Design a protein with these regions (language model features):
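Thiamine diphosphate
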Residues: 1-46
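Flexible, low-complexity linker and terminal segments
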Residues: 27-215
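Conserved PLP-anchoring active-site segment centered on the Schiff-base-forming lysine
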Residues: 218
Length: 218
């Protein structure tokens, strides 16, 4: 809840995904709110992981025309007893920890490949002078404010970050910016990977972004 419109704080709940080492999906508009639920379920089934489906106040208060695709029927999978997986004793947790780390690596690879094909992540190359990595409602603001020719890497799968994709994108632009609300969640990880970028120096740590704040950064 950036700017505390209906809560006592504006804590950045993206950190929960990182702490729990699970996938996180963030839509930026009404169409994606519908589409990304199906993609989040796909991610969950493919990688046997919980998915944190994160929406912010501004995304939840948005509205727009939404196209529906063909309805897909799914059969319920039968219950299979799996004590090692579902009973988290110390011995089971010890054995399962490597599986969690392997899952994160597979999710990173998915973010660089399949997620680009199904629209979960989106790459929009411009003239190469300015590149912006962004997600959620910040993408909508940046698209409206920054001039034509700006390159965008718009992430719907925001944890784990597809670092190889980000590194490749960074190599194709002269100046790289990270635009996100609240904490420098993506920015810190990108800098930790040795990729120079500019972020909170321009947009700040407080409150939700808007066209005015984003235009100041531009």
């Amino acid at each position: 809840d950036p700017s505390c419109h209906s809560s006592q704080n504006e804590q950045d709940n993206r950190h929960y995904a990182r702490a729990a080492k699970i996938a996180m999906v963030e839509p930026s508009d009404a169409q994606e709110c519908k589409d990304f639920v199906a993609l989040a379920c796909e991610v969950s089934e493919l990688f046997d992981t919980p998915v944190l489906y994160r929406t912010t106040t501004r995304v939840c208060h948005s509205k727009g025309l939404v196209e529906f695709g063909q309805r897909t029927e799914h059969t319920h999978a039968p219950y299979a007893r799996n004590v090692r997986k579902f009973v988290c004793t110390p011995a089971h947790a010890y054995a399962n920890h490597p599986l969690v780390e392997e899952r994160l690596e597979k999710l990173r690879e998915y973010g660089c490949t399949r997620a680009l094909e199904n629209g979960l992540n989106k790459l929009e190359m411009g003239d190469g002078r300015v590149g912006i990595i962004t997600a959620s409602i910040a993408y909508e603001y940046a698209k409206e404010v920054f001039p034509e020719g700006t390159s965008f890497l718009k992430l719907g799968l925001t944890f784990p970050l597809p670092m190889d994709l980000i590194r490749d994108f960074a190599s194709k632009v002269e100046k790289l910016y990270v635009i996100e609300e609240l904490e420098p969640f993506m920015e810190d990880q990108i800098k930790a990977a040795g990729i120079p970028c500019v972020g909170k120096e321009l947009t700040g740590l407080l409150y939700e972004l808007c066209l005015l704040y984003t235009s100041d950064a531009a």
